[in-house]
A protein has these predicted regions:
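Short acidic active-site motifs
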Residues: 84, 282-286
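Metal-dependent phosphodiesterase/nuclease catalytic metal-binding core
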Residues: 36, 150-213, 221-248
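Short, charged N-terminal beta->alpha structural module
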Residues: 247-269
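Active-site metal-binding motif and surrounding structural segment of the metallo-beta-lactamase
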Residues: 40, 51-98
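Conserved beta-strand hairpin/beta-sheet module of binuclear metal-dependent hydrolase folds
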Residues: 2-60, 150-153, 157-161, 255
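Active-site neighborhood of phospho(di)ester-bond hydrolases with catalytic His/Asp-centered motifs
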Residues: 45-47, 69-77, 97-100, 159-163, ...
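FMN-binding flavodoxin-like domain, especially the glycine-rich phosphate-binding loop
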Residues: 171-212, 216-219, 261-276, 286-384
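Metallo-beta-lactamase
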Residues: 2-5, 99-148, 193-199
Length: 384
């Protein structure tokens, strides 16, 4: 696939994968992107996952048209992008492997020392001329590994962004809607590192970028302000959409009834409510919603003098990703010693700028008329 006259797409689609990184459900598969810049000198940008080495290598050879590459540029050492470095070096021993000091340390860890005999170590801001194309290297540490770097091609004004601006899904399954699976990808993979993403966005703002070539998902072209704006919101932990995320667990259905009643009361007031059963949903979708909306209500039971395991796991996912700048409410259920609200609130003690609504709803087994009235008050408070 030709992206520009000189930039060729040589990535692959993976429809065999069920869990990305061993945890994220990817019903539409995954794309492992790789690119080749064909100029006076040829640069190959990253490799692909191990299972697709032969397919990738065939696409690479087709793009080369009988020529030999001069460089293999490693933006990110995660194995879904680096697994075929050894195969590339075996086929093209005269090509230089381009990376930074941390890149080469990781190559030694994954492949053993001595693999890269011809290497070019670059620093932040260094340039590499291919002829018409000149690449500028921009370090992006912890987006989302410490060795990550991006490169900017001044000729075609393309940013090779590593995992940033990626999304779930194979390229032959992409629809027009980018935001949802890009958001789920960002919150799951990169969400913890908002400060580092903000630093990269500041670097990107200094460049004239016409296209973004990520390591997952489609090449982004046209008006890039939408994607940049979302990344700015996500990485600054801002509120993307007005609404309330309701996440619940329920043992016998009573807490579920309370959560569903709250959703109904919110919608009656014209407020968007996104509700998730944490025991049955894709938890990454629930995490996505918790970061998308400005308000979050957690509903669960006291369980073994703690909270229900799926709720604890969910809150851990949020706090590990620096959940902040949100308004929270609690619905708790306990037959003899309800303590879930207190326990959940304590889990957010180190989170920044978390506000709590006044109303906490406490069920003692089944929902009562008094509980229903409290839920109505909670909905009213959340809609202010």
């Amino acid at each position: 696939m030709t992206i520009t006259n000189d930039i060729r797409y040589i990535g692959v689609n993976d429809h065999d994968i069920d869990l990305f990184e061993g945890q994220y459900i990817v019903p539409e598969g995954m794309a492992y992107n790789s690119y080749a810049i064909i100029d006076e000198k040829i640069a190959v940008m990253d490799t692909v996952s191990a299972d697709f080495g032969e397919k990738w290598f065939a696409k690479l050879q087709d793009a080369l048209g009988g020529r030999k590459p001069d460089y293999l540029i490693i933006h990110h050492m995660e194995p879904d992008h680096s697994a075929n470095i050894d195969k590339f070096i075996s086929a093209y021993p005269e090509a230089a492997v381009v990376g930074n000091a941390k890149t080469f340390a990781m190559i030694d860890q994954f492949f053993g020392s001595g693999l890269c005999k011809n290497k070019l170590a670059v620093k932040n801001g260094d340039t590499l001329s291919l002829g018409r194309h000149e690449l500028t290297f921009l370090f992006a540490p912890m987006v989302h590994w410490p060795e990550v770097m991006m490169s900017y091609d001044g000729a075609d004004k393309a940013l090779f962004s590593a995992d940033a601006f990626g999304k779930f899904g194979a390229l032959d399954c992409q629809d027009k809607e980018w935001d949802c699976e890009a958001r789920r990808y960002y919150m799951g993979i990169v969400g913890k590192y908002g400060m580092q993403v903000q630093a990269v966005l500041k670097k990107a703002a200094m460049l004239d970028i016409k296209m973004i070539c990520p390591l997952h998902g489609p090449v982004l072209t046209g008006d890039l302000s939408h994607y940049m704006s979302l990344y700015d919101i996500w990485s600054s932990y801002g509120v993307e959409s007005e609404g309330v995320c309701i996440a619940y667990t329920s043992v016998y259905g009573n807490t579920k009834k309370a959560a569903e009643l709250l959703a109904k009361k919110l919608e009656e007031r014209g407020c968007k409510a996104a509700i998730s059963d944490l025991a049955r949903c894709d938890m990454a979708e629930a995490v996505e919603d918790a970061f998308r909306y400005g308000k979050l209500v957690l509903a669960t039971t006291t369980y073994n003098a703690d909270i229900f395991p799926f709720m604890r796991q969910f809150i851990d996912h949020l706090t590990e990703r620096n959940y902040q700048n949100r308004t929270l409410g609690f619905i708790e259920n306990g037959t003899w010693a309800p303590a879930a609200a207190k326990i959940m609130k304590a889990m957010f003690e180190k989170s920044r700028n978390i506000n709590y609504i006044d109303t906490t709803v406490t069920l003692r087994s089944a929902m009562t008329e008094e509980n229903a009235e409290a839920i109505d008050r909670m909905a009213e408070e959340l809609c202010r």
